[in-house]
Amino acid sequence: MKKKLLSLLFLVATLALTGCGYKKPEVHSMLGMNIKSITTVCGTDCSMDTIDTSSTSDHGMITYYYTDVAGDKGISDAKTYYNYLKSEKHCIKIDDFDEKKGNYSAYFQLNEKQVKSGFLMKVSFTKNSYTVYIEDNI
């Protein structure tokens, strides 16, 4: 009995630490991107471990935030990333916003052949920071 209780406790602790086996997705593979593309947009210090994950609805929607404060370099990287997404055949730009010097946002959605509906990406940047938001139904 004691052994079963310890086994159960170990299982619960393992699930708590691993998020019930759910791993943060490798975004570059979801978009058909190579790792260099993600490294570029995140800056040198960004890794999958530094992405904040938060629930945004009761339906299992998860939002991933990639944020970096990098001044002009950050703007350059964000524009590169935006242009990359715009050029990808399986990324559809579904909305964009006021384009100003140093301030731009756009929403991208993968076409239905690549992923189920509900996947949305937003790229935004200002003079001091840039953020990539990714929402994914799990």
Positions of predicted regions on the chain:
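Positively charged n-region of N-terminal signal peptides that target proteins for export
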Residues: M1-L5
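C-terminal motif of bacterial Sec signal peptides marking the signal peptidase cleavage site
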Residues: A16-G19
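An acidic-aromatic pocket/loop used at catalytic or ligand-binding sites
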Residues: G21-I138
